[in-house]
Amino acid sequence: MALPRNLLTDNPELYEARFPDPDRLAGRWTEDCLRRYGAGPRVLDMGCGTGRDAAHLAGVGRTVTGADVSEAMLAHARVHHPGPVYVHADLHGFDVGVFDAVVCLDSALLYCHTNAQLDAFLTSCRRALSPGGLLVAEMRNGAYFLGRTDLLDTPTVSSFTWRGTVHRSTTTLTVDRTAQLLRRTRVWTSNDGSAPVEQRSAWRLLFPLELRRLLTSHGFEVLELHDGPGPRTEPPWREGRLPAGTTDADRLHVVARLNSPV
């Protein structure tokens, strides 16, 4: 799968400036999940991006492979977040070794837009996991958009400064009900005289019961499925906070164990 041109994924340092995580919240949340369910040391971070979370997991003693489809992200990760082994791989089908856990954070799983792509991802996870291995994923919650339009009504404007240049983004979200996708149009402008850049992307909208059934059909036992707390929730997760019993808010978190063969 070739990535479309994208200002942030093509410029990993810019990505980290736009989405700072100085406390490694996502990595710590993931390690908490892995530790709580006794995962072994071998971890695959699928869709690892700049490598921050993979490096955190390596730093606490795990043997980590970070995988991504973006060569720019992988090159950045190898230099700036050493520790893991970084490899090129596609969510829609991969075979990069055997692990005790597969991690897929920040809605990366939702770039599987079709049922066939979701099946291919979970088939690859099943192949990659040792018996009893864990899948830990964090993503947008499709159920949030049932009857809610607050994230759709008004474009979201944000800005940040990187190396003296102010970058401003205007993001519009729309729901494609037929394809069950959340489509995003983002227009970037900056004060350095560059022409505006328009980018389009999409996430699959998965609903909690749909995700549970999908995982079960691929041989996983769902251990947790909830809307928080997590690294992207408000308030965010912190050590000692246990999962909620609801799946109503805008993020969805899942921990599933691959059933051992009978």
Residue ranges and their predicted role:
Residues 1-49:
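Conserved class I S-adenosyl-L-methionine
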Residues 51-93:
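Class I SAM-dependent methyltransferase SAM/SAH-binding core
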Residues 92-101:
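A short acidic, Gly/Pro-enriched loop at the edge of an enzyme's catalytic core
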Residues 100-116:
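A short SAM/SAH-binding and catalytic strip from SAM-dependent methyltransferases
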Residues 119-131:
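A short glycine-rich, Lys/Arg-flanked "PGG" loop and its adjoining helix->strand segment in the class I
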Residues 136-213:
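SAM-dependent methyltransferase
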Residues 205-262:
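C-terminal lobe and adjacent flexible extensions of AdoMet/dcAdoMet transferase-like proteins
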